C-alpha cells in the first residue's frame, strides 16, 4: 500500500479528515488507513463512522489494529502512548 493512502488523525476538526478520506475514495483508491495516537483515537473512530454512515455507505471496516508505542521525552523519560490503525475498504 502506498503512503498516500494513509490519513494521520490529529487535532483538526473531524470533518477535515472525513473530507480527506472521501476525496481519496472518490479518486479511485479502494483502501484508506486511518492512524491515530493518544487522545486522537476517538477522533479516528468518529471519522470512520461518519464516512461509513453519512457519506459512502459501501465502505467497510476491514481491520482495526491497536498497539502501544513507547515515546521518549526530552528529559530521557519514556511514556507509553496508545495507537490505533483503522483500515477502510470499498
UniProtKB/Swiss-Prot annotation:
Supply the alphabetized keyword list.
Chromosome, Cytoplasm, DNA condensation, DNA-binding
Q: What are the recorded GO MF terms, alphabetically?
A: double-stranded DNA binding; RNA binding
What broad class describes the main subcellular location of this protein?
cytoplasm
Q: Which Pfam families match?
A: Alba (PF01918)
The listed locations are: Cytoplasm; Chromosome
Q: Which SUPFAM superfamilies match?
A: AlbA-like (SSF82704)
GO CC annotations, alphabetized: chromosome; cytoplasm
| Example GO biological process | chromosome condensation
| Family from the record | Belongs to the histone-like Alba family.
Biological function:
Binds double-stranded DNA tightly but without sequence specificity. Involved in DNA compaction.
UniProt-recorded name of the protein: DNA/RNA-binding protein Alba
**What is the native source organism of this protein?**
Methanosphaera stadtmanae (strain ATCC 43021 / DSM 3091 / JCM 11832 / MCB-3)
Q: Which gene encodes it?
A: albA
Amino acid at each position: 500500500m502506498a503512503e498516500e493512502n494513509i490519513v494521520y488523525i490529529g487535532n483538526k476538526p473531524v470533518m477535515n479528515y472525513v473530507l480527506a478520506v472521501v476525496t481519496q475514495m472518490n479518486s479511485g483508491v479502494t483502501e484508506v488507513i486511518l492512524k491515530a495516537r493518544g487522545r486522537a483515537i476517538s477522533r479516528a473512530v468518529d471519522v470512520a463512522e461518519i464516512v461509513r454512515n453519512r457519506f459512502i455507505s459501501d465502505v467497510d471496516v476491514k481491520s482495526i489494529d491497536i498497539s502501544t508505542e513507547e515515546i521518549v521525552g526530552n528529559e530521557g523519560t519514556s511514556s507509553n502512548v496508545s495507537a490505533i490503525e483503522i483500515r477502510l475498504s470499498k
